[in-house]
Amino acid sequence: MKRLITLCLLGACFLSAPAQNYVSQVWVADQGNGTYKNPVLYADYSDPDVCRVGDDYYLTSSSFNCLPGLQILHSKDLVNWTIIGAAVRYALPPVTDVRPEHGNRVWAPSIRHHNGEFYIFWGDPDQGVFMVKAKDPKGPWS
């Protein structure tokens, strides 16, 4: 019996050895030479919308029923993006039923900049059209 346990342990050690050498790769679109490869954003940013303010670009996309919602991303070159905040911290309108509503809530947003303020508009198929605004794209949004 001891011999069987020893063999099993040795086998487990040999099987796990290759996994210790594996290092996962992070997707990088920027090739470092002025070019890029698609996809620029290796994630699910459905219905993206971008606005330019000076030399800066701001992106938001559908977040559906996920919170915090309407992630705000920033870029200087449309290739390298960083998440800088979220425009929706709680369900709009407030809900008492917390079951997931896939395909509902926040989708197809539009981000704009006008007179020193950022605006995001989006439609909810059941509730209507909503808007949040902020002076700084990092927030706070109201």
Regions found by a protein language model. Give the residues of each.
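Hydrophobic h-region of N-terminal signal peptides that target proteins for export
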Residues: 10-18
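Carbohydrate-active catalytic/glycan-binding domains of CAZyme proteins
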Residues: 19-142
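Sec-dependent signal peptide recognition
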Residues: 2-7
